[in-house]
A protein has these predicted regions:
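Non-catalytic terminal regions with compositionally biased, polar/charged low complexity
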Residues: 3-14, 21-168
Length: 168
């Protein structure tokens, strides 16, 4: 497979974003649709937003900014980062990723860091897991959880019982 893409304009003022999904006859595409969205901040010229809907019910909103100090907002989601992914909850699972950033706000979840870093927050079969490169604060459904840097952190969030393991 060879793929060539050319973008008209400067990459640092107009980010280029693409969605790739390998598929075969045995394992067909899981993507149902791809659409694009604009940030609510009309002054953002260097923003790209993609909404990827999967056949399994998962929807990912992908945010890309060339300046991590700027904020992009869309339908109640707010991101202050170079890159972020916000998924909906589907089959008891959910994924949120903050890439080189300090803030991610999504329905029911807030992630904040004092310095730019990467934070992966995943809900798998009803349990939350976190992996972060910098200390972060996570709020889930109004419950504040202060976290350090984690390597394989597990955050259990069941019936108001929260523990974070593997905090370095």
């Amino acid at each position: 497979l060879t793929f060539v893409a050319r973008q008209h304009g400067e990459a640092w003022t107009r980010p280029f974003v693409a969605v790739y999904e390998p598929s075969t006859k045995k394992e067909p595409s899981a993507i149902q649709s791809v659409s694009y969205f604009d940030a609510e901040e009309t002054v953002l010229k260097d923003f790209a937003g993609i909404c990827v809907k999967s056949k399994n019910g998962r929807t990912d909103h992908i945010f890309s900014l060339s300046d991590a100090t700027q904020t992009a907002t869309y339908q109640g989601m707010k991101v202050k980062a170079d890159y972020a992914v916000v998924s909906n909850e589907y089959a008891g699972n959910r994924t949120l990723f903050l890439g080189n950033g300090t803030q991610l706000v999504a329905p029911g979840v807030t992630v904040h860091t004092d310095q730019a870093g990467n934070v992966l927050l995943e809900k798998k079969q009803g349990k939350w897991y976190i992996l972060s490169s910098v200390p972060c604060t996570v709020v889930i459904n109004g419950k504040k959880i202060k976290s350090g840097i984690t390597s394989t952190g597990e955050m259990k969030y069941n019936n108001a019982q929260t523990t974070i393991n593997s905090v370095v």
